[in-house]
Amino acid sequence: VKLNVEGLKEIRKMNPAMTSYNVEMTEVTGGTFWKAYTPEQIAGKEEVPPPDFSQGNPVLSMLEWIDPIDSKNPKLIKLAKAIAPGLWVRVSGGWATKTYYDFDGEGQAPEGYQNRLTKEQWINILDFVKAVDGKLLISMANCDGLHKHDEPWNPSQAEKIFALSKEHGVPVQAVEFTNEPNMLYAVVDGYTAADFRRDQDLFHKWLSENYPEVIKVGPCTCDPEPMRSYIEETGQEETSGGGGVADVFPSCSTKELLEGCTEKIDIFSYHYYNGVSERMKAMSPTMFMPASEATSEKYLAMAANCANAYVPYRDKYSTKGELWVTESGDAGAGGHTWGSTYLEVHRTLNEFGCFATITPGVIFHNTLASSDYGYLQHGTFDPRPSYFATVLWNQLMGETVYDSGE
């Protein structure tokens, strides 16, 4: 490809924090996360076992226990800081929705919570964010331990984590009310979209009164329908809806989550994955694409399709004109077997470039150092190819986006 450098038209300046990342709450507290592939599975010499339905919930067979991350590790801090200064660090994920903030040392979480976050664990993460020159985005606890579906959300837990973060000198600078609320069954028992709208409005009112400087991000949607509709409208070949695990399980629509809300969000956020990984292939074969497709136009087009699909939602429901992809990865359910190899570099760099031409905003790679889609290998923190690609992107590409005419 030969570019006419003199004739390039500037589109925009990108958010300098575009290449941000996630630290899962389960990494902070210790808990279950997607089971790592074996070296033989990564090399294609061993089949990934299908989900075990005998346990009732087949997802349980795809998970393994991970101990709390050593966020003080010098190697982790050095590598995370090298990605770029001033990035967002998102601490969220499915576990965050049911995490009790045990900052008073009670020793156990009340009934209705799944796990607990100690004061020491949270301070360690705050110190990590400070050490890497980062900015903190979190999502809130919203589960049966806090309130029932027919009871309004209350700020008892939010007050704890916002106060401690501010007191420690690493304030929460942006927040999503609930991680992936489309999957209502994973929030509060009996929860509805109307309950979510009620509670997000209550939270945003509380935020405006107590922490008006904090950016309201949401709805953190993982809805597959917008991308499917966009693909149909543009006459493309049908693919996954981009929602990852949400493509497999029941979910409500983004419109249901936001239509009727009285408090407008500042920045619209969504999650994007190129379908599901080998772990979940048996549950939804049509949402899986093999390694042979990893450099295909169809596979690489998914990031741009997802961003384009959400531009109208950004314009309708938010005020600041940015899209934030608060989880992004090669595949839902922990990433593909090739997510930790050089084959993933194509998707990573392609996503950065396509996204930048479509909208200003931020992409939060999932994850920094957990499971097979992590920039760094869990435990050892050894960098993977997509990590080096992202570091080089930030060193070489700059913040100006041009229309190449291609």
Regions found by a protein language model. Give the residues of each.
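Non-catalytic accessory regions flanking glycosidase/transglycosidase catalytic cores in CAZymes
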Residues: 1-177, 181-251, 255, 259-266, ...
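Aromatic-lined glycan-binding groove of carbohydrate-active enzymes
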Residues: 264-274, 279
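Ligand-binding pocket segment of bilobal, Venus flytrap-like solute-binding proteins
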Residues: 341
